[in-house]
Amino acid sequence: MRNPDTLGLWTKTMVALRRFTVLAIATVSVFLITDLGLPQAASAYPFWAQETAPLTPREATGRIVCANCHLAQKAAEVEIPQAVLPDTVFEAVVKIPYDLDSQQVLGDGSKGGLNVGAVLMLPEGFKIAPPDRLSEGLKEKVGGTYFQPYREDMENVVIVGPLPGEQYQEIVFPVLSPDPAKDKSINYGKFAVHLGANRGRGQIYPTGLLSNNNAFKAPNAGTISEVNALEAGGYQLILTTADGTETVDIPAGPELIVSAGQTVEAGEFLTNNPNVGGFGQKDTEVVLQNPTRIKFLVLFLAGIMLSQILLVLKKKQIEKVQAAELNF
């Protein structure tokens, strides 16, 4: 006849096995998280950024240089997978939302639709996928969108635009991930992705001059003695100040909100603000996942599940033996 303490021994064994299982899972989880968390080793014309910042569109402060010309802040979004495998094509979806009913001031002062543009900074080694790697479905999403590298030697930084905003509030970038097995300079890990996207014309040209998509101010305090409408559009204001008279030219586009005889302070607005566009920036991350690690993780989890099943079967076997002993 067996010792009746068998049940107590079995209980202690089960507790020990469960503790080991929990510890093993926690260890693997911490390993994965820490390893993946740190990497190893004046219109919507994005190419104007190349003139002002030929080396990189991202300043040391983290700001995309498009913000130097597009002064208004607007929303921008980028959607990418949380993790991708090496040598895989995936979608980076850029969203540039705005009110489709809005009209911007064009260069000649007339109103028109907004254009959109974007610059997408991918991790080193990532690039726009070649056409022969795109599926039929992805080709349809991309359409005729033309993607251009920021520099010839910088395939991971891509610019697009200007594009008609009515059709391209959502732009699909087909991205090809690198393969560390083929390129030893690339490592697995988590990497940053930066987006800069604008809609509408900017307020400042790369030369530093103001565009007509601005609110214009009085340069000095004084009285507006004359308001002359120009034949080509816009206005010429004669401002009488304490030092004499001064001419203020207002280009075609902004609406005048002052009149002759009105006294203004220095810096007071003379026109409305016609700008309906703006720039948005978004930062996110993508993980270049090691497929071998995934295989080992699957095997590890399968082993845990198998051990749990065997433990349950063993428990039932012991319970049957104990029941037989009690009946004996």
From Swiss-Prot:
Record's cofactor remark: Binds 1 heme group covalently.
SUPFAM superfamilies to which the protein is assigned, alphabetical: Cytochrome f subunit of the cytochrome b6f complex, transmembrane anchor, Cytochrome f, large domain, Rudiment single hybrid motif
Pfam families: Apocytochr_F_C (PF01333), Apocytochr_F_N (PF16639)
Segments crossing the lipid bilayer: 296-313
Cofactor(s) the protein needs: heme
Localization of this protein: Cellular thylakoid membrane
Binding site for heme: 45, 66, 69-70
Taxonomy, superkingdom: Bacteria
UniProt-listed GO biological process terms: photosynthesis
Signal peptide (UniProt feature, chain positions): 1-44
GO terms for cellular component: cytochrome b6f complex; plasma membrane-derived thylakoid membrane
Keywords of this entry: Electron transport, Heme, Iron, Membrane, Metal-binding, Photosynthesis, Signal, Thylakoid, Transmembrane, Transmembrane helix, Transport
The protein's role, per its UniProt record: Component of the cytochrome b6-f complex, which mediates electron transfer between photosystem II (PSII) and photosystem I (PSI), cyclic electron flow around PSI, and state transitions.
HAMAP family cross-referenced by the UniProt entry: Cytb6_f_cytF
Oligomer status and interactors: The 4 large subunits of the cytochrome b6-f complex are cytochrome b6, subunit IV (17 kDa polypeptide, PetD), cytochrome f and the Rieske protein, while the 4 small subunits are PetG, PetL, PetM and PetN. The complex functions as a dimer.
The protein's name in its UniProt record: Cytochrome f
Organism: Synechocystis sp. (strain ATCC 27184 / PCC 6803 / Kazusa)
Recorded name of the encoding gene: petA
